Curated annotation (Swiss-Prot):
Protein name: 2-methoxy-6-polyprenyl-1,4-benzoquinol methylase, mitochondrial
Subunit annotation: Component of a multi-subunit COQ enzyme complex.
GO molecular function: 2-methoxy-6-polyprenyl-1,4-benzoquinol methyltransferase activity
Pathway(s) where this gene product acts: Cofactor biosynthesis; ubiquinone biosynthesis
NCBIfam families per record: MenG_MenH_UbiE, PRK00216.1-5
Record-linked InterPro entries: SAM-dependent_MTases_sf, UbiE/COQ5_MeTrFase, UbiE/COQ5_MeTrFase_CS
PROSITE patterns, A to Z: SAM_MT_UBIE (PS51608), UBIE_1 (PS01183), UBIE_2 (PS01184)
Summary of the function given for this chain in its UniProt record: Methyltransferase required for the conversion of 2-polyprenyl-6-methoxy-1,4-benzoquinol (DDMQH2) to 2-polyprenyl-3-methyl-6-methoxy-1,4-benzoquinol (DMQH2).
Family the entry assigns: Belongs to the class I-like SAM-binding methyltransferase superfamily. MenG/UbiE family.
CDD domains in the record: AdoMet_MTases
Transit peptide start-stop: 1-30
Catalytic class of the enzyme: transferase
């Protein structure tokens, strides 16, 4: 185990399940008017209208929700658990903190935060109701976590239905690349955080060039096949692989975070850049 831990470190660089609120996707779309008619964006490697992308992404995660955690284990050979443990272990969570975990549907990050910080409360938010349903069912089995410490909210990350200056910590794990406008998500995170609040985003990123041929071969030839075998859905996992390649690289995403007002912006690569942890702070007034 010690050897495995050292290897991981060497691969990184500098029944009631709580409250539940729902904001329909249509209502959020109407209120936000984020997508401009006819304006193009990408859905994987395919160009689509912005509004169409949102619906396609929603369809992907509705399809994979029940097999989502199983597929994460299969695709990463369990390494995603190490990434998430390390990510949460490095969070600075104040006493009695209010945390917002966006795109947190199945609860993977929220449950870790609640164990890591016994006084914290977490709002788990996701645009996809089936993902939240899976998370709430998981919460029923988490006997060491008080249901009142978790709130489940169906909402869109590009216009969050939360008051400004509310949260001490904003987390988002493997979700922001699926958003049509990542910069708007970061902007909303800045808004809902208290002054001095922390942003921490875990996302797939640009892998080290030496590993790229092997990584690409595995991603394009193995992951879609696993999706077909384990989840009966090859297309959704083909999109997953493609979406990673379309997301900004580490430096570009750090620039977005900085431009939206965050200070002390930095990132840390895990597993040769397969994923990265991005952090920033909302300046104190």
């Amino acid at each position: 185990m010690k050897g495995a831990t050292n290897l991981f470190k060497s691969m990184r660089k500098p029944t009631n399940v709580g409250n539940f609120r729902q904001f329909s996707v249509n209502q959020v779309n109407s209120d936000n008017k984020r997508s401009e008619p006819g304006k193009k964006t990408h859905f994987g490697f395919t160009d689509v209208d912005e509004a169409e992308k949102e619906q396609k992404v929603h369809h992907v995660f509705a399809n994979v929700a029940k097999k989502y955690d199983l597929m994460n284990d299969a695709m990463s050979m369990g390494v995603h658990r190490l990434w998430k443990d390390y990510y949460v272990g490095g969070l600075q969570v104040p006493y009695n903190a209010k945390c917002l975990d966006m795109a947190g549907g199945t609860g993977d990050i929220a449950f870790r935060i609640l164990r890591h910080s016994p006084t914290a409360k977490v709002t788990v938010s996701d645009i996809n109701q089936p993902m939240l349903d899976v998370g709430k069912k998981r919460a029923e089995k988490e006997r060491d976590i008080q249901p009142s410490r978790a709130e489940w909210v169906c909402a869109n990350a590009e216009q969050m239905p939360f008051e400004s200056n509310t949260y001490d910590l904003f987390t988002m794990s493997f979700g922001i690349r699926n958003c049509t406008h990542p910069e708007k998500v970061v902007r909303e995170a800045f808004r809902v955080l208290k002054p001095g609040g922390q942003l921490a985003i875990l996302e797939f990123s640009e892998v080290n060039s030496a590993l790229k041929p092997i990584y690409d071969a595995y991603s394009f030839n193995v992951i879609p096949v696993l999706g077909e075998i384990l989840a009966s859905d090859r297309a959704s996992y083909q999109y997953l692989v493609e979406s990673i390649r379309k997301f900004p690289n580490q430096d570009e995403f750090a620039r977005i975070i900085r431009e939206e007002g965050f200070s002390n912006v930095r990132y840390e690569n895990l597993t040769f850049g397969v994923c990265s942890i991005h952090k920033g702070m909302k300046p104190r007034k």
